[in-house]
C-alpha cells in the first residue's frame, strides 16, 4: 500500500529463517561485546564467531580512538567496516513541532530526561551543543512514564532554574504533548557516517 521497496529490520541478524539481501552488524565502539556473555547472562544474542556472517560492520558511537579489542578477530578478513556516531538533528516542541535551533540552547539551563539503553549518550549530545544541563534524570530503558514522574521532572526543573525541558524522540511518543508548562522539546538524533560512506551506500542502496 505504501510502495515500499526496502525493509530494514532491527535485531534481524539472529533470525536465521529470514530471507535477507544484506546483513549489517552493529558494534558499539564503547562495549562491542558487552560482558562477553550470551543472553540472558549478557547482551550477546549469538556467539561472537557468528559475526563472520555479516556483509558489513558498522561501529556505532565511534569516538576517534582505535577499535576496541576483539572486533578484528571476530569478523571475516577484508569485511568492510563503517564508523559512525550520533549527532543532534533538530529540536521540536512537544505541543506544536515548532523548531528550536540548537544554537539557542547555548549556555541556557536545561533539564533533560530519557529512558534509553545508553542515557549518557543523550547527555553528551546536549553538552556538545553547549547547553547547560542543570538536571538530568535517566530512567530505565523503555520506561513508561507516570503522571508522578512528569510532575517530579517539572518540579525539579523549576527548582534548579531550567528554562527548557528536553527528552528524546523515543520518549516523546509516550508523552502527552501538553505534559509540561515549561517549554519542552524532543531531540531528534541523526546517525553521521564518519568513515566508509561509499562502502555503506554500495551495500545498502545498490
Could you describe each region identified by the protein language model?
Residues 2-5, 157-163:
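Glycine-rich phosphate-binding loop signature in dinucleotide/nucleotide-binding domains
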Residues 27, 84, 137, 187:
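Hydrophobic residues at beta-strand termini and immediately following loops
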Residues 63-71, 120-121, 172-176:
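Short, charged/polar "capping" segments at the starts of alpha-helices
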Residues 89, 140-144, 180-206:
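Short, flexible loop segments at boundaries between secondary-structure elements
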Residues 92, 96-98, 103-147, 201, ...:
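Redox- and metal-dependent alpha/beta enzyme cores, enriched for Fe-S-associated oxidoreductases
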Residues 144-161, 170-172:
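A short, acidic, amphipathic alpha-helical segment used as a generic capping/interface helix at domain edges
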Amino acid at each position: 500500500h505504501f510502495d515500499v521497496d526496502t525493509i530494514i529490520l532491527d535485531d534481524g541478524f539472529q533470525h536465521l529463517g529470514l530471507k535477507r539481501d544484506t546483513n549489517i552488524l552493529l558494534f558499539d565502539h564503547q562495549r562491542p561485546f558487552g560482558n562477553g556473555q550470551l543472553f540472558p547472562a549478557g547482551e550477546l544474542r549469538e556467539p561472537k564467531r557468528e559475526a563472520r556472517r555479516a556483509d558489513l560492520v558498522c561501529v556505532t558511537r565511534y569516538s576517534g580512538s582505535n577499535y576496541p579489542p576483539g572486533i578484528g578477530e571476530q569478523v571475516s578478513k577484508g569485511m568492510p567496516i563503517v564508523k559512525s556516531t550520533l549527532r543532534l538533528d533538530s529540536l521540536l516542541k512537544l505541543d506544536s513541532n515548532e523548531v528550536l535551533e540548537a544554537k539557542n540552547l547555548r549556555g541556557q539551563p536545561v533539564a533533560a530526561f530519557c529512558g534509553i539503553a545508553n542515557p549518557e549518550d543523550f547527555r553528551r549530545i546536549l553538552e556538545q551543543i553547549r547547553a547547560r544541563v542543570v538536571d538530568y534524570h535517566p530512567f530505565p530503558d523503555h520506561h513508561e512514564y507516570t503522571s508522578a514522574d512528569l510532575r517530579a521532572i517539572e518540579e525539579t526543573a523549576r527548582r534548579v532554574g531550567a528554562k527548557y525541558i528536553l527528552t528524546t524522540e523515543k520518549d516523546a511518543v509516550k508523552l502527552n504533548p501538553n505534559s509540561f508548562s515549561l517549554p519542552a522539546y524532543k531531540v531528534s538524533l541523526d546517525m553521521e557516517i564518519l568513515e566508509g560512506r561509499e562502502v555503506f551506500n554500495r551495500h545498502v542502496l545498490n
